[in-house]
């Protein structure tokens, strides 16, 4: 129905049989697509490889931070960060989509953070990678008392940058239109320390 979603990230599934060694494949991928949140999980029955640059959530004590990415520009050798920032700011589509994701992530944080503590630290900054520029905003908040790690994960996952917004109605639309469950794809990987700090 009209108005059920403002932005939707529909995905397709591609499969291919291969005898490639997972470790070699991972390192080859890193050479052409360096990302700070990359990982390789090896198991007896499967391997999982990811090269995402995004920090969905980071919790230290009672402070939680999210850094949504919404906006990507191929980088050339002569291109500068200033050029990339000007491009994102002047591109109406990129700017509006970024604003929508930021608003949604602020809303997610407000469910688990103290009133008035959800703040934007860095709005619409440009992060430089080997072949890309990303449009990134950093948002932080102070957690309410008695908020569990389960509460945090439930509020923040999945991230808005991989589904669209608003979250619930867009997820329902994706579930009805995508033929195969995403499973691990566009999921989150991270850790929870013994003291409760976490990063995904």
Language model segments and positions:
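Extended alpha-helical targeting/anchoring segments
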Residues: 1-200
């Amino acid at each position: 129905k009209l108005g059920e979603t403002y932005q939707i990230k529909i995905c397709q599934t591609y499969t291919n049989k291969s005898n490639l060694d997972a470790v070699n494949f991972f390192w080859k991928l890193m050479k052409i697509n360096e990302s700070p949140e990359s990982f390789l999980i090896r198991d007896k029955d499967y391997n999982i490889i990811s090269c995402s640059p995004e920090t969905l959530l980071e919790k230290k004590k009672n402070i939680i931070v999210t850094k949504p990415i919404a906006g990507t520009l191929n980088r050339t050798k002569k291109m500068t960060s200033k050029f990339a920032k000007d491009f994102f700011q002047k591109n109406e589509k990129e700017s509006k989509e970024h604003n929508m994701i930021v608003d949604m992530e602020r809303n997610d944080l407000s469910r688990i953070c103290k009133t008035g503590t959800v703040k934007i630290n860095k709005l619409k900054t440009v992060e430089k990678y080997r072949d890309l520029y990303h449009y990134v905003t950093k948002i932080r908040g102070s957690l309410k008392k008695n908020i569990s790690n389960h509460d945090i994960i439930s509020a923040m996952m999945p991230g808005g940058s991989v589904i669209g917004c608003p979250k619930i109605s867009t997820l329902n639309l994706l579930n009805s239109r995508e033929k195969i469950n995403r499973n691990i794809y566009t999921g989150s990987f991270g850790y929870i320390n013994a003291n409760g700090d976490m990063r995904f």
